[in-house]
Each structure stands twice: as structure tokens, then as C-alpha cells.
Amino acid sequence: MTGAGGQIGSWLVPKLRGLYGNSRVIATDIRQLDPEMAESGLFELLDATDSEALGEAVESHQVGLIYHLAAVLSATGERDPRRAWHVNMSSLEAVLEVARHQGCAVFTPSSIGVFGSGTPKDLTPQDTVMQPTTMYGITKLAGELLCNYYHQKFGVDTRGVRYPGLISHGAPPGGGTTDWAVDIFYSAVEDGH
């Protein structure tokens, strides 16, 4: 799992380790995880844009499914859109190439950030007007298309879900649009409330 220390990964790694065993879920992140998660199973410091290191990790651990969660989130992406494009697209392309050559499946989340102001607000269909207004949304839409391409062209089993805004206690604010809500809870705990 790339991006294991983020809002989704910090919850999903322990859940998957509980289901499949600590040695069957390899958590990776660009930064060190909290000690409890890092020590509960396999962990590697890994930059998901480094396709060679990613390929070596997948091969050495005989990975069958990559959960690709590493990303520059929306608010951070607006402060540095070039970095958001590079990290989000280069890491996804690296994951898809590794999956293609090593025969593993890929799950990568998308976001309601793919939509825009022209998208119907109620009962939004899967296939509709998509005019994202953030670099994060643009990379998620491009990512959906890239996953579809790898499935159609190379047979890579890719899956995804468009998540709404996420709020999690499992990870500190990481640059997303819902960080203000997460920060409220962290600040309250730090201030003794």
C-alpha cells in the first residue's frame, strides 16, 4: 500500500492486517509511520514516484494487489499545482506500469473533486459533465482515464471509488479540503478539551 500513513491508509492497513495477517500487508509511505503501525507488520520507506523502488518492493514481497493511496491532496495541490501533478500522475503511472509487468491488480481512490460546478448536484450519474476546479480533481480525473486505458490496453485489473470529503482521526491533517475539521479535533485534544 502506497501512502499508508494518510487518512485512508492509517485506517485500512490495520483492518487489512487483521483480515489477512501482518506479514501479508506491506505498508509504504514517503515518511515514517507511527511506531504502532510500522511495528505491527512490514513497512518500507518508499517514494511512490520511484518506479524502480516500487517494482523491487512489489517483486520482493510477491504483491498481488497494490492499494495506491499516495497523493498530494487538494489544498496542498493548489499551493503547488506542478508538484501535485507530478506526484499524483507519476506515482499512478509507476504503479500501473509495475502492475502491468508483474501481473498484479490496482485499487486507487478517486474523488468527488473530479466534478465541477456544471455537474448535477442531485443523483449525480457516473458519466456526466466533469470540469474539476482544482489540480487534485484534475489529477483524479486523469487518473480514472489512465486506469481505464491500462485496463483496456494491457488488461490490468484496476478498481476505484470516488470518495467524498474524508474526515479521519487516524492521521493528522494532510493538505485536503476537510483538514479544517480534522484540525478542530486535534487542537481540542492538544488543548485538553
Describe these PLM feature segments:
Residues 48-87:
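NAD(P)H-binding glycine-rich loop region in Rossmannoid oxidoreductase-like domains
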Residues 1-19:
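N-terminal Rossmann NAD(P)H-binding glycine-rich loop of SDR-like oxidoreductase domains
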Residues 139:
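Active-site helix of classical SDR
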Residues 38-50:
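Rossmann-fold cofactor-recognition segment
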Residues 86, 93-135:
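Conserved Rossmann-fold NAD(P)-dependent oxidoreductase catalytic core, especially the SDR/UDP-sugar
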Residues 20-34:
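Conserved glycine-rich Rossmann-like NAD(P)H-binding loop of the short-chain dehydrogenase/reductase
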Residues 2, 28, 66-72, 106-112, ...:
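SDR active-site strand-loop-helix element
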Residues 145-170:
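Conserved beta-loop-beta element that borders a ligand/cofactor-binding pocket
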